[in-house]
Amino acid sequence: MKTSDPRLTKALAHPLRARILADLERQTCSPRELSDELGEPLGNVSYHVRQLAGLGLVKLVKTTPRRGAVEHHYRAVHR
């Protein structure tokens, strides 16, 4: 992905964000699923997914109830 926006360049320079974005280009996942798949703490993954969503690189596509909470599922936005 090529970009001239410095915010996007900085966001994509972070290794974990790049890995998350690559996974979400292939499949829809929740932060918990990404955490398990990438072997990273859930808090870190959730933070970076929110950052990517704030930049419009991923979007919320589905919510499902899970143990009294709501699980959010994201997918990469193709630009």
Residue positions per predicted region:
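Short alpha-helical segments that sit at the start of domains
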Residues: 1-19
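A short acidic, leucine-rich amphipathic alpha-helix
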Residues: 33-39, 52
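Short alpha-helical segment immediately N-terminal to, or the first helix within
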Residues: 22-24
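Glycine-centered, phosphate/nucleic-acid-interacting loop/turn motifs that mediate DNA/RNA or nucleotide
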Residues: 56
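A short linear hydrophobic-aromatic micro-motif
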Residues: 20, 59-61
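Short, cationic-aromatic polyanion-contact patches
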Residues: 8-14, 30, 61-79
